[in-house]
Amino acid sequence: DQEEPIILKDFNRGAAYSGPLVILVNKYSASASELFTNVMKDYNRGVIVGSTTYGKSTMQVVLPVNEDEPKDGFMKLTTGAFYNIYGKSHNEKGITPDVELPDGTNTTAHAPSFTQPFEVPDVQAASRIPVNAPLGLDNIISSSTKRTMNNDVFKKMNLQREKFDQLFHKSFDLTLENVFKHYQEITSLISELEISYTDALFTVEDHESTTEILKYNSIDQEYNEEIKLQLSSDPYVQESIHILTNFNN
């Protein structure tokens, strides 16, 4: 039998951060990150940027088929689902961002192929939940679209995505030679889609607490520099900064 919905309340009143917020997501965002994103979107708390998320809002538990014989295997049972304040689940559908960005991985080759996804029915919406006023993102979306249309990296992603879709649906005789050739074509396209983390687009600085911690570990210092380089040369992060700046103004 279906149990009554349980409303999860915030036992820590107040906010740790109340400033402008941008959340980057894509189809690999699932589970906890989707729950957080969904809440932020429902409450109009921040701008969701990127591409539609995976779409998982269910909870599972793994149990042995036979507790006395572990070798008999295990089974995974779905025991519950998460809903937003309006009584709807993002399971299977995912969360659509407020501002969509080109995604080189968002191809039909990566599209979900589940023929019988787990259907989560709606439940009664929560009552008397105060939310922030709509953010009013029309100008932000328009400005972002213009920037991405003129961005060489994003333009290349759109072109390569079309090529990848064509290659994925290509038919060929199943021979070892053809399979190897097809594999080489795919890996070649994937390498072209990869972002070159070499040219910094902006400056990334460490927080004072991070600087203090890094004093005592040279390996972490090197790793930290690599992370900063990747962030400073990532076009998605750069566009998110533009959006955050527009949103703040």
Question: Model regions: which residues?
Answer:
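C-terminal "post-core" interaction segments
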Residues: 1-249
